Amino acid sequence: MKPNFTLLLAIALLSASTLGAQKKVRVDVVLPAESAWAEEPPAVSSSGLLSDGSMRDLLSNGFPARLHYRLERWTSGRWFDDLKATFDWDVIVKYDVLGKKYQVVRVVNKKVESLGEFAGGGEAENAAEGPYHPAISLPKKGQRGYYNLLLDVETLSLSDLDEVERWLRGELKPAVSGKKNPGTALGRGVRTLVVRLLGGEKRHYEARTGKFKP
């Protein structure tokens, strides 16, 4: 049994025509109350990342979405700003086609935390994009600075597609010796085309707070 690349192309072509109607994306980094600037991290949240047609189509067909977050804490200097701390985490959303439910997990320092299983895509989106307080080191009192957030949403990458094919279908099986499965030139070409039709392997977003001084 071979991968159904015809289905993938159909999904990509259909999704490409619906991108203009997607929900507006928002990415927010919200500071705590002023009295807690040196005691609590900001709240990171987003909306609309998983709402466009291409992402929903891919999710409903068993392809996972990965949201990679990187929060940076900077201090403000007279001439230059200085990066003082970073914190990275991932949120992964996967649709179980057989069980007909969405699975949402957060991965921090290689530790996986389940955020729940949901029957609807909207519920899964709310869980994936809801407020999160990352455990980044906090500024000292009197230290002027700001937080900057970098977010990459992987709509579909070549490596992810290969992993999905192995995990969900068992069709790609690398040799035990460690050699890569050669596949076919046609298969690799179609997978590349699917990625391009979807608008690239990643979508990048940024957000930052205003400058503050605890």
What are these regions (language model features)?
Residues 22-65:
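N-terminal onset of structured domains
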Residues 46-51, 70-72, 152-154:
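Generic short beta-strand segments
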Residues 6-16:
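Bacterial N-terminal signal peptides
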Residues 141-214:
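Glycine-rich, aromatic-bearing surface loops/beta-hairpins
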Residues 38-43, 61-67, 87-89, 130, ...:
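Residues at beta-strand starts and edge strands
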Residues 1-5:
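Positively charged n-region of N-terminal signal peptides that target proteins for export
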Residues 26-28, 92, 204, 211:
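Ser/Thr- (and often Asn-) enriched beta-sheet segments in non-cytosolic proteins
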